[in-house]
Amino acid sequence: MSGWGSLQHRYESVEPRKILALDGGGIRGVLTLEILAEIEKQLKVQLKKDDTFRLSDFFDYIGGTSTGAIIAAGLSLGMSVQKLLDFYEKKGEAMFDKVFLLKRVKYFYNDGPLLKVLKETFGSRDIDLKNGSFKSLLLIVTMIRSTDPPWPISNNPNAKYHDPGRPDCNLRIPLYQLVRASTAAPYPFGQGILT
C-alpha cells in the first residue's frame, strides 16, 4: 500500500468507507454545490470542526462524471464547497459557452473555454493521479469513445491501471485532461483526448 502516501493510515483504519458520488448536468452543478454546502455546514457542526473542515476530511472516496467530475476533483484536492461555488459562478458562463448554430451538428458547447478553465484550476501538467495533493480518493468516470464502455479512472494505488509498469498507466495523465475527458459526453462538448 505504499502508493497511498499520507492517506495510508486513514484507509487502513477507517471502516466502513464513506463515498460521495456526483452526477453530471453542466452548469446545474451549482445546484449540487448548494446541497453540498449545506452538508459541509451541517457536518462541521455535528463533528465540531472549524472552518478548515472540508468534505474530503469526511468522505473517503469522491467520484463523479461530467460536471460531477469537476466538483469531485476539486473536493478531492481539498477545495471548500464555497471555493467551487465561486468557481462555477465566475467561470460557469465561459465553461458552458454555446457554439455557433452551424457547428451544433457535432457538439453543443465550445470546449476551448472549458479546457482553459480546467488547466487554470487543475494545473497544466503538475497535477496528476500520483500527485500527493489529494485529500481523498478520486474516481472520474469517462468512456472509451471507440467501444462505449465506461472507463473509471482513480487515484487508488490498487487500481488496475495505476501500475507505473503498464504502458496504459493512468498516472501520467494530467488531472485537467481526465476531468475534460469526463465532460466529453458525446454531444455537449465533443470528445476529449488523453495524452
Each model region followed by its residue ranges:
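Patatin-like phospholipase
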Residues: 4, 16-21, 27-121, 154-165, ...
